[in-house]
């Protein structure tokens, strides 16, 4: 896209779609870029369905992955770096008249930071930022299609979804039985922790996966992706009509 093409697209758009994710380990069978590849693919589907209502931004590959740093290849940002990066993108878009941003987030570790970023964007920039993560948007569909009690990372669910959205990141010939699973505490363990505690991934698992990827099912992945895409599009169309905050900002 040239600057003149961008000028036309931004003039028509009511919102921007921004893909984010992470570069981190995903067990023995999935690539380091799994999260951003999935986030990018979902963002492309969303932007395509929205048409001229939205403009698709270049993706932000890196995210918050401190808890995976014992596994080689993982690259993490500090929370303040991640926040500054997203907010600078939002501020730049606002300069060109787009003050609503939907962050299509492929990484669960970014969720808490994105909540704070949304507040800061409204307070300091007068912009609306919404973030959606596929595992949250489709949580009810996922629960119907889960075969094991423990899942959450490089598991049958994430493998199934990636096989649909970004099959190039999945090496099915390397899928293996779970190894070295441990409980830290029943109330902090995935997939539904009841107590917030910082736990590092290597304290739960030796191979970097939580769940059994051998149980992946492409048809389940298709069903989850269909539900997530439909809900994301419905939300984005409503979001595009939400009134903007007063400038220069402020929680209203």
Model-derived features: where do they sit?
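Extended, histidine- and acidic-residue-enriched regions that form the cofactor-binding/catalytic faces
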Residues: 1-102, 108-252
